[in-house]
C-alpha cells in the first residue's frame, strides 16, 4: 500500500505558546498529499515517562528564540513530567562550529540553525524559502528549523500542537511540515502585488520612513516592492494600506486614539495602520509586519482588528492621581507656597534679578529612584524650577525615562532576566514597554514599587508646575513631531520652554495657531528669555564643577553671579532656599 507525506501550508490556528511570540493566534494546517516511498519506522521520542532524546540548540541563539525553545521544553515537562536535556551544538572536535556529521545512534531534537548535518541539509533543500519553517524527521533526529525567530517559534508551536499526545510522543518516520509565508495567495504575496501604501502628504519623516521600510521588508520577503505614495494620489487597484491619519474616510472612521496607542484594522480593500502619534504609527506598521510574519494575519479577505493598550498599563500611575501622592519628607519639611508657585518659578528662570533657581538632576534622588514618577513629583513639590530627565526608546517605540542604555544599574533586571519569557538582554532597546513593566526601579540598591515610567506620565507632572530639562539619549526623536505632539497630548507645551528655548516655542505656536493661551505664553516669555537652555545648562555645570553640589558651593556660586544650580540634592537645596530667600516680586 502506498503511503503519503504531507506538505503543510499554514492558513490559521491557535498558538500553543502565546508567551513565546507575544501573539495569540497562529496558522492552521492545510495539507497537500504528495506521493512518496513507504514511511520509515516511527520515532518514539517519549514513552512511559522517559525519553532518550536531547534538545540541541545553536551555541549562539537569539534571546527570543531561546525563550521559545525553553517554553517548548516546559510544555513537555508539564504534560509528561519529563524534562528533556538542552545542550548546545558546540563540541571540542568542532571548535570552529563546522558541520557535525550524522550519527543516527544519537537521538536529538535539533532546534534552530544548528551545526548538525541534518539541519544544514534541510536549509539547503529549501533555498527559496525566504520566510517560513521546515520540520522533518530524518536519521533518527527531529529537525525544527525556521528562517527567523518568529518562524522558528511557530515551528515549535506547530510540532507541539501536533505531536504531544495523551501519554507519549511518537513521530512518523516520514514526518515533514513546510510552511512558506510568501507562497502564492498568502497575505505577503497579496500585499506585494496588489496593495499601495498611502501616507498623509504632510506626514513627518518618521511615518514616511517606516512606510518605506515596510515596503522594503515586503520586497525582501516576496521579491516585489509595493508602491508608497501620498494621499493626494489615488491607487490603481483601490487596495490600500493607510499609514497614519490619511485623508481617506477609513482613517477618519477609526476615531480618536490616545497618544501612545495604535490600531490595526483590515476592512474591505483597506488596511488601516493608525497611531496617536508618529511613534505609535511606526509601532503599528512594525506590529502589522510581525502579525504577517507570524501568521496571525493569515488572510486579507475577512475583517480584522488589533489595538494596543499602553495607556491601560499606566492606569495606576501616580501621574494620573497627583493629589494622592504624599512625599517621604512631608512630616519633616513644609515647603513655602512661593517656592511651588509656577509664575514665580518662571520669573526666577528668566529674570536677571531673580533668586537662584534649581535644576534637579533626575528628580529627588535623595529620597526616590532616579527618573521615577515619585522622584520627579517630589522634586517639583520641593520647589524645583527645572527637573532633568533622561529619555530612551523601547523596542516598541515608547519614550521612557532611563539614563543608561543598560538596565543593570537602575532595575532588578539581574533577578528577572529570562524568566517568564522576559528578554535576557540588558539593553532597554531590546525590551517592549509591557516587558519593562515587569521590572522595578532600585533605590539604594533595593527594589522598590516603582516601574520605569513613560515620558507621557512625566509630562503630565510638569504641566503648570515646573520646567523640563529633556535629556534625550537617542537620536531618533523629532522635536516638532514626537515631542510637540506629546506636549499637546499632555497640555505641557509651556514646560519645554527652558530646554528648547523661545524659537522652538514660536515654531510650536505655528503648528497649532488656535491655541490662544499658548500664544500668550510665548509672547510673554519672548520678552524675558535671552539665553537658550543649552547656554544656561553650560553655566550650571560650570558652577557645580567649580564649587561643588552643597551649601557652601551654592553660596559661592550666588556671590559670583550664577543664577542656577544643577543639583543631585534638591531636598537640601530647597531647605536652604526656604531659609535664605523669599518670594520674588513678580512683574
Residues covered by each model-derived region:
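Phosphate-group recognition and catalysis centered on beta-loop-alpha active-site segments
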Residues: 326-587
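N-terminal low-complexity, Pro/Thr/Ser-rich intrinsically disordered segments
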Residues: 29-49, 178-188, 329-358
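Carboxylate-rich, divalent-cation-coordinating active-site regions
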Residues: 85-184, 188-190, 208, 221, ...
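Bacterial lipoprotein signal-peptidase II cleavage site
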Residues: 21-28
